[in-house]
Amino acid sequence: MTNTRKSHPLIKIMNHSFIDLPTPSNISAWWNFGSLLGVCLGLQILTGLFLAMHYTADTTTAFSSVTHICRDVNYGWLIRYMHANGASMFFIFLYFHIGRGIYYGSYTFMDTWNIGVLLLFAVMATAFMGYVLPWGQMSFWGATVITNLLSAIPYIGPTLVEWIWGGFSVDKATLTRFFAFHFILPFIITAMVMIHLLFLHETGSNNPSGMNSDSDKIPFHPYYTIKDILGVLFMMITLMSLVMFTPDLLGDPDNYTPANPLNTPPHIKPEWYFLFAYAILRSIPNKLGGVLALVFSILILMLFPILHSSKQRSMSFRPLSQCLMWVLVANLLILTWIGGQPVEHPFITIGQLASVTYFFTILILMPSTALMENKLLKW
C-alpha cells in the first residue's frame, strides 16, 4: 500500500512542496528568506486578527482603541508591537530575498519573478494602509500626502483622489475602507504566494553557482526543514528583542499624537522601509515626474530578466558585477537615509544624485559590465 503522504489528494500537495521536494544540495542561507517570509506572513495575519478584534475603524475612536489594546487587553501591547515590528522584519526579509534574486540571477525564472514583484506591490500597499489605521499624526498626514500623489494623473487625477478618499479630504470614509483593504489584502497575498510557489516548483530552485543542479538534488525534508527552523529561531530572537526592549525604535514619535487635520507635522515621512522610494519621489521637482519615478523605482525589477546580458546566470564568478551589486546596495542605503532627512541643502542634491545613480546602475552599468565580462571570458 502507498504511503498516505504520497496518495492523499491534499497531503500529496504538501509532500511535493515541503517533504519530498528535490532541492539543490548547495543552496546557502540566502535561500532561507522565502520560508522566513512565509512565517512572517502567518505571524502578521495571526497578530492582525487579534488586533482587529479590539480595533475600531472610526476617526473618533481609532486612536483610543489602539491605546486600549496596549493598556487594557491581555498582552495587547505584545500583539500590537509584534504586528508593527513584524512588518519591519517582513520588509527586511523581502529586500534580502529580492537582493538574493538579483545577485544569483533567480530572475530568469520569469513567471516566479514577475508574480514576486506583484507580491512586493501588494505588501507595500498593505503596509501603507496599516500605517494609517492607528490614526496618529503621521498616519493622517502620510495618507494625505500619498493619496494626493494620484492627483498627478492627467485628467482623471483629482476625481480619482476624491473617489479613494470617499469625500473631499482624508476622513472617516477613508479610514474605514483602508481597514477593509488592510484586512483582505493579506489573504490575497497568501493566494499569490501559493502561485509564486507553484511557478517555482515548475522549474525547481536556483543555486549559488547558477548552473543546472538536476544531477545533485536532496530531499527538502529533513535537510532544509531543519535549516529553515534555525532561520525562524534567529528571526524570533531578533523580533522579540525588538518588541521587548525597543518596540518604538523603528516607529515615528509623531504617531503618538492623535491625528489633527489643522496641524501639519514639520517632517512628513513614511516608515523606514519606504524611505528609499520616498527619496526618489522627492528628488524630482515635478509632481507627475516624481510619481512616475516612484512607481518605476519598483517596477524596474521587472526589467531585470530583459536586461540580463551575461553568459553566466549568477554573479558568483563575476567580480565586476559583484562590485556593482554592492554599489546598488550602498546607493539604496543612501536613499533610505535621505528619505528621512528634511528637504534642504545638501540633502536635496545627494538625493538627486543617488536617484540618478540608482536608475543608471540598473539600466546601463550592470548590463554593460556583464557584456564586458563576456568579452573577458574569451580573453
Swiss-Prot record:
Binding note for cofactor: Binds 2 heme b groups non-covalently.
Membrane topology reported for the UniProt record: Multi-pass membrane protein
Listed InterPro entries: Cyt_b/b6_C (IPR005798), Cyt_b/b6_C_sf (IPR036150), Cyt_b/b6_N (IPR005797), Cytb/b6-like_sf (IPR027387), Cytochrome_b (IPR030689), Cytochrome_b_C_euk/bac (IPR048260), Cytochrome_b_N_euk/bac (IPR048259), Di-haem_cyt_TM (IPR016174)
Residue stretches spanning the membrane: 33-53, 77-98, 113-133, 178-198, 226-246, 288-308, 320-340, 347-367
Requisite cofactors: heme b
Keyword Cell inner membrane part of the UniProt annotation: no
Binding site for a ubiquinone: 201
A Pfam cross-reference name: Cytochrom_B_C
Cellular location(s): Mitochondrion inner membrane
Annotated residues for binding of heme b b566: 97, 196
GO CC list: mitochondrial inner membrane; respiratory chain complex III
PANTHER family membership: CYTOCHROME B
Function: Component of the ubiquinol-cytochrome c reductase complex (complex III or cytochrome b-c1 complex) that is part of the mitochondrial respiratory chain. The b-c1 complex mediates electron transfer from ubiquinol to cytochrome c. Contributes to the generation of a proton gradient across the mitochondrial membrane that is then used for ATP synthesis.
Other comment: Heme 1 (or BL or b562) is low-potential and absorbs at about 562 nm, and heme 2 (or BH or b566) is high-potential and absorbs at about 566 nm.
Quaternary structure, from the entry: The cytochrome bc1 complex contains 11 subunits: 3 respiratory subunits (MT-CYB, CYC1 and UQCRFS1), 2 core proteins (UQCRC1 and UQCRC2) and 6 low-molecular weight proteins (UQCRH/QCR6, UQCRB/QCR7, UQCRQ/QCR8, UQCR10/QCR9, UQCR11/QCR10 and a cleavage product of UQCRFS1). This cytochrome bc1 complex then forms a dimer.
Name of the protein in question: Cytochrome b
Species this chain originates from: Ctenomys maulinus
Gene, per the UniProt record: MT-CYB
